[in-house]
From Swiss-Prot:
UniProt keyword Ribosomal protein present: no
Organism listed in the record: Rickettsia bellii (strain RML369-C)
Subunit record text: The complex is composed of two ATP-binding proteins (ZnuC), two transmembrane proteins (ZnuB) and a solute-binding protein (ZnuA).
SUPFAM superfamilies: P-loop containing nucleoside triphosphate hydrolases (SSF52540)
Keywords annotated in UniProt: ATP-binding, Cell inner membrane, Cell membrane, Ion transport, Membrane, Nucleotide-binding, Translocase, Transport, Zinc, Zinc transport
Any one Gene Ontology molecular-function term assigned to this protein's record: ATP hydrolysis activity
Domain called ABC transporter: residue spans: 6-222
Keyword Cell wall biogenesis/degradation: no
Recorded coiled-coil stretches: none
Positions with a binding annotation for ATP: G38, P39, N40, G41, A42, G43, K44, T45
Name of the protein in question: Zinc import ATP-binding protein ZnuC
Length: 233
């Protein structure tokens, strides 16, 4: 059985009079893809900040192995599109030259050889997101946190991105924690789905999202229309 690498136990966080998350409990298991979904203002960013150690819980307990190396890909990667820098230069700035064979294979998968001489500003959204993801792997993290990685990507780019995530998990034995608002892509590609709206509404495997299940009803109440999923299966 896969062991948890992060555990939240009855965690609440207050900012002044605001309580973005209240009594939240969940675990992230090693080598799983766990996706956190929820509407805007649900507390997803607060969860990430707590996981990264940027905030401390007001109450409750968070258990994270202090040796755990965490990589983070923010929703908006602050890199000026006017920057006259090539993909290769960008990655060289972030990485030592002694890349492992596994990371070289991932670079091959994102077609780095073809892209390396392109300016960052000329990349498509999907290409740029894959380059940012590759750069986050250079520190060889145990866990990678992806904040809305699929936003503004077309369907083809989303599929390619998930293929890359699957390869990364397999080759590098990395655990993936992803924030998303796209339920249908999540259903196909996650081991665990956590639905958050200030508190945990439901959690389980994508298989638990069946017609009229508690999971499905909770998602529907937050505006996630699960009948599309029923249609496909």
């Amino acid at each position: 059985m896969k062991k948890p690498i992060i555990e939240f136990h009855n965690v609440s966080k207050k900012f002044g009079n605001k309580l973005p998350i209240n009594n939240v409990s969940f675990t992230v298991k090693k080598n799983n893809i766990t996706t956190l979904i929820g509407p805007n203002g649900a507390g997803k960013t607060t969860i990430v900040r707590l996981m990264l150690g940027l905030e401390k819980p007001t109450s409750g307990e968070i258990i994270i192995d202090p040796r755990l190396k965490i990589g983070y890909v923010p929703q908006k990667f602050n890199l000026s599109s006017d920057l006259p820098i090539t993909v290769k230069k960008f990655l060289d700035l972030l990485a030592p030259n002694n890349l492992t064979n596994d990371i070289k294979e991932i670079h091959s998968f994102i077609d780095l050889e073809r892209l390396k001489d392109q300016k960052i500003s000329t990349l498509s959204g999907g290409q740029f997101q894959k380059i940012v993801l590759a750069s986050s792997l250079l520190s060889k993290p145990d866990l990678i946190i992806l904040d809305e990685p699929l936003q503004s990507l077309d369907v083809t780019s989303q599929q390619e991105f998930y293929q890359l995530i699957s390869l990364i998990r397999k080759k590098l034995d990395i655990t993936v924690f992803m924030i998303s608002h796209d339920l249908f892509t999540v259903i196909k590609n996650s081991d665990q789905v956590i639905c958050l709206n200030g508190h945990i509404c439901c959690t389980g495997t994508p298989n638990a999202i069946t017609p009229n299940s508690d999971f499905s009803n909770a998602l529907s109440s937050l505006g996630f229309y699960t009948h599309h999923h029923d249609h496909k299966h």
